[in-house]
């Protein structure tokens, strides 16, 4: 395949006598001089004496005109050198590709670089964004889902000719990994069933069908939507997620796609929305269950703490002591231990310190078993230290 290298200059050649014919074609010169008369001149005009007469590349006939055109070492009639598309004569420059001639306007329209997003041609002076073999306008280099314009440094994925930002690609990956949509999404309305062929009904018989898993079965062609087509579909989906036949036909006419492609896109979009709603509901249920478990645990902990709380002051009993219930003088002065045979066993007397405690009274807490610190100190001051009592007994014994 020949590739055009740019506009070719057209040269005009003037044919002379038989000795100069090949020379003039090789050097690509243009000359104009008076015609000679006579037999030789007539032979030159008829081309009978020119053994290397030029043949037109377009019509494949010998060139007997006074002037001829040369393009890529090929000769052309002036009337044959014209654009293949618009049929306009080429006088100053042309583009040559696949053995065909084009003018500048038609060549740029057919073979110039086109944006992979909007499919419009890209001017030579425009800035572009490249992704592998695809070229985009700066405004068309955006995510096909969220339509966010991708800039230098952003992470994206080029999947089947469509640009996806990182977040939307991960969402789509999670949707695909979670499983296929429910069978309820494949149910079609009455007007949709007319567009489906009866022979394709076995595809939706169940998940156990081997039709989709047969490696020998050829894959169906995947339709890649442009940005304008996707915007038109989304705008119609916001109005109605299940449009009627008339709306689908209108969308198909506007986008240049078939009615079947429009119908399949709406089915896939409904399944996607339903799957997202189901996932959101599962997340809400999981959060509610976690919150309920935390509330149950906190209520149990509060119950355990309240079961070990101290008793109210009205329920606590403090043991009090009466000063008149015991004698401050455990023995009589002037009596010695031998004169009081039983006093050496009970030097402080037989009276008990604690009185008036009913047998029915029970200790309800550990605080009932202890006296206040101030009361214990006052009692020790009144009773005295036992060591001091022993010394006083000894001094009274020897004094007697």
Swiss-Prot record:
It is found in: Nucleus. Its main location: nucleus. GO terms for biological process: glomus development; neuron differentiation; pronephric nephron tubule development; regulation of transcription by RNA polymerase II. One of its GO terms (molecular function) is metal ion binding. Signal peptide: none annotated. Required for early specification of the kidney glomus, lying upstream of wt1 in the pathway controlling glomus differentiation. The balance in levels and expression patterns of binding partners such as lhx1/lim-1 influences differentiation into glomus or tubule derivatives. Involved in specification of serotonergic neurons. This is LIM homeobox transcription factor 1-beta.1. It comes from Xenopus laevis (African clawed frog). The gene is lmx1b.1.
